[in-house]
């Protein structure tokens, strides 16, 4: 395994006035800050997408309908709607978790910014001090060099004048050489003083540079670790959401396994059956066969008219015979026993169709039902209803909270 390299050993520059290593490190930290923002933006957009998706799933589940279905498929569809809503809620919760992770990253990024700013301020100070003293030192060195050259020139001139010059020229040259030497000595003193100050500034800068490199490396280590963990957690959150979705949909699959197609068909037939026999064929009737030969001494009256009159009398409460009619006619209009039984039997069937409960019984609604017209009643699963009339066609008259209407009898169970 490769040994861990250190920033403090790899980001120096031989140019005294250059700070390339520090600038490279600082740019790396700024690039890392941008990377943090990129990850935050990814989490922000994913959270928005999860929230939109979750809310749309909830709306889809609540508007799915399915009230026209019944029995086991209705149960499975209701389970699908419920689990779809649960999946939507889970995705909304995932969006909240992503926003919490986003908030943590933002706080981490701001903490790193504050720490980096402190070191930037220190480095700016020591770098400016070093550069300023370096410039001052170089100027003093330049002055020192010039003073030394002037002193050398003055010394050489003094030596030439001393060999063959006048006393006055010798003294003048000697004084100039002395002054130049003193100026050179002073320039050397200033130069040495600046060198010492520059060395102290350089030492301070070097120490701060090492400290800053170590701090920047620690920041980079923390940033990489935090972002790696954040991406790992993000992937785990998405994977867990997939598992959660599958668990919720598994509940739907379990209800679908119990869906009985034949049972649903049988249940529909039992609750909605309209009869077991088809209508009888319509017989041919000869127009002239409807006329009946009248009896001797009685008026010519068709039997069908007598049947209609008797049927009307039963419906409206009129007497069986008309007082103004002759006795002979009354006897003639009396139908045969077979026809009489047919007429009365048909009326009795109509009068007794549907079992009217003398005392209303309580039933519980097994399913929701939405009224399709004004004479039906809306019910919800669990409602307690009083059954007034059990219709043979499968539609029962019920009462709830003072309201009456028709509901499917198969939707109720007796308490």
From Swiss-Prot:
Q: What does this protein do?
A: Involved in regulation of the actin cytoskeleton. May regulate WAS actin-bundling activity. Bridges the interaction between ABL1 and PTPN18 leading to ABL1 dephosphorylation. May play a role as a scaffold protein between PTPN12 and WAS and allow PTPN12 to dephosphorylate WAS. Has the potential to physically couple CD2 and CD2AP to WAS. Acts downstream of CD2 and CD2AP to recruit WAS to the T-cell:APC contact site so as to promote the actin polymerization required for synapse induction during T-cell activation. Down-regulates CD2-stimulated adhesion through the coupling of PTPN12 to CD2.
Q: Source species, please?
A: Mus musculus (Mouse)
Q: What is the lineage of its organism?
A: Eukaryota, Metazoa, Chordata, Craniata, Vertebrata
GO CC: one term? stress fiber
Q: Where is the SH3 domain?
A: 358-415
Is Membrane tagged as a keyword? yes
* Name the record gives this protein: Proline-serine-threonine phosphatase-interacting protein 1
Q: Does the keyword Phosphoprotein apply?
A: yes
Q: What assembly does the database describe for this protein? A: Homodimer. Homotrimer. Interacts (via coiled-coil domain) with CD2AP, PTPN12 and PTPN18. Interacts (via SH3 domain) with ABL1 and WAS. Interacts (via SH3 and coiled-coil domains) with MEFV (via B-box zinc finger); the interaction allows binding of MEFV to PYCARD and facilitates formation of PYCARD pyroptosomes. Interacts with DNM2 and FASLG. Interacts with CD2.
- A single GO BP: inflammatory response
Stretches assigned to coiled coil: 94-133, 162-215
């Amino acid at each position: 395994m490769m040994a861990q390299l250190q920033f403090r050993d790899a980001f120096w520059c031989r140019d005294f006035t250059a700070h390339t290593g520090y600038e490279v490190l600082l740019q790396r930290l700024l690039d890392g800050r941008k990377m943090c923002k990129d990850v935050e933006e990814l989490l922000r957009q994913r959270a928005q997408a999860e929230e939109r998706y979750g809310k749309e799933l909830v709306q889809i589940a609540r508007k799915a309908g399915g009230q026209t279905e019944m029995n086991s498929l209705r149960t499975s569809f209701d389970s699908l709607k419920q689990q779809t809503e649960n999946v939507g809620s889970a995705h909304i919760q995932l969006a909240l978790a992503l926003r919490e992770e986003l908030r943590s990253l933002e706080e981490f990024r701001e903490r790193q910014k504050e720490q980096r700013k402190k070191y930037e301020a220190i480095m700016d100070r020591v770098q400016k001090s070093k550069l300023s003293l370096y410039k001052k030192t170089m100027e003093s060195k330049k002055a020192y060099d010039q003073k030394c050259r002037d002193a050398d020139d003055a010394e050489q001139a003094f030596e030439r004048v001393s060999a063959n010059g006048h006393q006055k020229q010798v003294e003048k040259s000697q004084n100039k050489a002395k002054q130049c030497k003193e100026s050179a000595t002073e320039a050397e003193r200033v130069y040495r003083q600046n060198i010492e100050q520059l060395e102290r500034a350089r030492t301070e800068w070097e120490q701060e540079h090492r400290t800053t490199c170590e701090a920047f490396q620690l920041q980079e280590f923390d940033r990489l670790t935090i972002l790696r963990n954040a991406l790992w957690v993000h992937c785990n959150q998405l994977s867990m959401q997939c598992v959660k979705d599958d668990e919720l949909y598994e509940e739907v699959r379990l209800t679908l396994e119990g869906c009985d197609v034949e049972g649903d068909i049988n249940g529909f037939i039992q609750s909605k059956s309209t009869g077991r026999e088809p209508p009888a064929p319509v017989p041919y009737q000869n127009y002239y066969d409807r006329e009946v030969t009248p009896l001797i001494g009685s008026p010519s009256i068709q039997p069908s008219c007598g049947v209609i009159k008797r049927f009307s009398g039963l419906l409206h409460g009129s007497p069986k015979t008309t007082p103004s009619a002759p006795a002979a006619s009354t006897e003639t209009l009396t139908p045969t026993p077979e026809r009489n039984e047919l007429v009365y039997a048909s009326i009795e069937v109509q009068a007794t169709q549907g079992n009217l409960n003398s005392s209303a019984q309580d039933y519980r609604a097994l399913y929701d039902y939405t009224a399709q017209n004004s004479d039906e009643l809306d019910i919800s699963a669990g409602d307690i209803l009083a059954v007034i009339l059990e219709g043979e066609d499968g539609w029962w008259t019920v009462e709830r909270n003072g309201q009456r209407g028709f509901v499917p009898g198969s939707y109720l169970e007796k308490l």
